[in-house]
Amino acid sequence: MPIYDITLTISPNMPVWPGDPAVELTQIASIDQGANANVSQLNFGVHTGTHVDAPHHFLNDRRTVEALPLDVLTGPCYVLHLDDNVAAITADALEAVNLPPGVSRLLFRTRNSDLWAKGVTEFQTRFVAVPLDGAEWLVRRGIKLVGVDYLSVSPYKNSRPTHVALLQAGVVILEGLDLSQVAQGFYDLYCLPLKVAGSDGAPARTILVG
């Protein structure tokens, strides 16, 4: 059964959300310089690349990333392709697609994924995102996990309403997916965030099987 790695590679030249720290990988011990082993130090924000948001990210309620439920982060999911002319994942856009019944984990493949396929490293502000009415639609539909193929589920400069609507409803948010090589359909999702105590988010190695 094929395995799709939908995780962005963490590197110093990858795009990050404006104001977040850039990725820095520094070698602090080197065999070439007489050390017993090569050792590196990695610095970056917890919302870098492919990552999950904990409720504490926007709700300030101390529900942090190490407590996210593994039974939601893993299991059957549906990858939904949206046409390139879809500029926002609104309630109307969602009503227009034929989402199969019983889907509780939903990943959106939009034109954003073409940015990853092309190797675009500059942060893009006009990415396809989920406005508030789309988030409310997902909550009504019973979605437990939503994944998007850029660095935020929310529109740029209007990030709070969507995040709050989803996180208050207990929806796990998975951001920064590369779905450029994934066809529409059902898969098994395995999303394992770093277990960082007290954190509002964490990077997550994420794969699809199927």
Tell me the role of every PLM-derived stretch:
Residues 1-210:
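Active-/binding-site microenvironments in catalytic and ligand-binding cores
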